[in-house]
């Protein structure tokens, strides 16, 4: 299809034109996201960010190009959350569209998962990092979650704990917006943003989803079983599977 044949998509009602208006939109989006994250716990002052933007090396592009993650501390757990997937998009005509990919993603784990204090070097940060890049690469994960209630992924983590990888040396995650400890959405001046929580799966749980005739139903049943388990929707490596193939 030539450029002349690509249908024109009209800007949304919240779109703005020009660099200054776009900068204000970005500042408003960041302020709304920061306020939401602060409502979840104590936010570390420093963000986690790569020295070189992955999009410069062939990785997926985030809406405002900036890629970062926040660490949010609770009394008994730590949340690692993406910080930028819901930034405004800018097109070649300096038109800024708010809310980016319409989502942010996070993982919550017990304090014991970070006993050495190296959050940026942890397998849980690797999980959130890879999930964030998958979301940016796909572009419409919000539509999948709205349609099916949840999605699952198999990720190639660099150094996961023993016993988490399946026969393909991948680690499964369940992704949805129903975690009882994290709100499903947060508000911005331009509309809501979906907050997706990833829960790491045991290999048997990932296999159960893959073998189910109704995978959406299997994911929903797994989400309910996880929520009712002692660890809830926290990502815990050494727990028993709550559902089997």
Q: What residues fall within each predicted segment?
A:
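Short linear motifs embedded in intrinsically disordered, proline/glycine-rich low-complexity segments
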Residues: 1-245
